[in-house]
Amino acid sequence: MKKKILIVSGGISKERIISIDTGKQVAKELRKNGYLVKICEPDKNFLSITKNFKPHIIFNALHGQFGEDGYIQSILEIIGIPYTHSGVISSAKAMDKEISKRIFKKNKILTPKYFLYTFNKTDKKLISEINKKLGFPVVIKPINEGSSVNVFICTRRNIFSKLKLLKDYKKVLIEQFIPGREIQAAIIGKKKLGAIELKPKRKFYDYQAKYNSKAKTEHIIPVDLKKNDYNKLMDIALKAHRLIECRGVTRSDFKFYNGKFYLLEINTQPGMTSLSLVPEIAAY
């Protein structure tokens, strides 16, 4: 009897299109390998589809809010069907950038300096705090989005216009900007899968650089690092994976500057599209 796998993809987050693409790519590969596959949305029909299809496992192909923040994982725990990727608590910890950065700092993993901003300071006080704690330029980002959605590099001149775009989030992370090389490392289970370097033509590896085929981001694999540096990179990625208590696959995003690796964040639901990095690392 063929094993049945239900892929849940789409959803209502800003990464819906990426999730749909991930679901299609995963379904294609699973069918090639002899599995009986069905794709569904996490909507009002989800529970009845699950009940009728009776999958052996659910492949979580959702990205962003409600897909990698512990929400869908909670539902899957309640209905008692095994599912892929990280569980409820680990997903929530990884998705909340402020919580995950606190865990990194506590465990001596280097991460850019930051503070949480809740839109309750005057312009003058905010500028003063940034100058004192971080210095310009800075990176501003929602604490609970993925795929670099609404992430901006800001100078003193444009920070307030960019913050206005994020006001609906209520709180955002203001983070020290680290120049240098963009390197991402993948872990699967307890295995160090590998790493890839990115050279975007844009200012940084944002949403467009990730998913627009015309953005022409250069992917470099193998990464040009000394053996000791490469081993250090993969050790940090595995340490972060374990600290957040992840399972399955994760991708950790780093900046490499002045001989040091700065961990930006860990992703528990890395994309599996034709432009995604983990499949490229795995295929190498």
Show the residue positions of the predicted features.
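ATP-binding N-terminal substructure of ATP-dependent carboxylate-amine bond-forming enzymes
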Residues: 1-89, 93-95, 99, 118-126
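Active-site nucleotide/adenylate-binding loops and adjacent lid/helix of ATP-dependent enzymes
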Residues: 1-9, 37, 52, 93-181
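Hydrophobic alpha-helical membrane-association signature
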Residues: 22, 233-236
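Anion (oxyanion) recognition and catalysis
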Residues: 31, 77, 105, 132-134, ...
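Phosphate-binding site of ATP-dependent enzymes
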Residues: 155-232, 255-262
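A short, polar/charged loop-to-alpha-helix boundary motif
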Residues: 203-207, 272-281
